[in-house]
Regions:
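Mid-membrane cores of alpha-helical transmembrane segments in multi-pass membrane proteins
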Residues: 1-7, 45-56, 73-82, 103-106
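Extracellular/periplasmic helix-loop-helix junctions in multi-pass membrane proteins
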Residues: 150-175
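Alpha-helical transmembrane segments in multipass membrane proteins, preferentially the mid-helix core
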Residues: 56-59, 84-85, 106-128, 136, ...
């Protein structure tokens, strides 16, 4: 299933990120460069798993004939805008706050789509079981994904706290990827 694929991809990337983080701290402890956040690795993981989570919404609705391909592409596109703008802001390739705002606007669009837009309208025409699954995933995308902008803030500004950022991102990933 898509949920198992999301969990498997996350497990693989977290195994790799753990090694990166451990090696970075060992280098710092030995007098080398300061340990940094595995930002690129984290965004690679998200660029795979987040669109898969969005696809799961579509597949649940498509399985009962209640979704259009256009709905999938709108959700997929919004998820990419959200992630790419977040990466550009966090990596310093773009201005931090405007990139956060663009990413949040894309996330808000996804939230709108699943609570009031075509995705919601499609879900309303399905069975009670499908409605239940859809609502559970909608809550995860709304509440669970709200953790990420908080983490983003921890890594920005003149005194970023990368340890707190990574702890918060790890908690968010565990909550969101296992609950999904």
């Amino acid at each position: 299933t898509v949920a198992a694929l999301v969990t498997g991809v996350a497990w693989y990337h977290y195994t790799y990120m753990r090694e990166h983080w451990a090696n970075a701290y060992a280098t710092e402890a030995a007098g080398g460069a300061e340990a940094t956040s595995p930002l690129v690795l984290r965004y690679i993981d998200w660029l795979i798993t987040v669109p898969l989570q969005v696809a799961e919404f579509y597949l649940i609705l498509a399985a009962v004939g209640a979704a259009t391909a256009m709905l999938f592409w709108r959700l997929f596109g919004a998820s990419l805008v959200m992630l790419i703008s977040g990466f550009l802001g966090e990596s310093g390739q773009g201005p931090e706050m405007p990139m956060l705002i663009i990413g949040c606007l894309a996330w808000f669009y996804i939230i709108y789509e699943i609570w009031a837009g075509d995705a919601k309208k499609s879900a309303d025409t399905t069975s009670e079981g499908t409605k239940f699954a859809f609502k559970a995933m909608a809550l995860i995308l709304t509440v669970g994904w709200a953790i990420y902008p908080a983490g983003y803030f921890l890594g920005t500004g003149d005194d970023p706290n990368f340890d707190a950022l990574n702890i918060l991102y790890n908690i968010a990933d565990v909550v969101n990827k296992t609950a999904f």
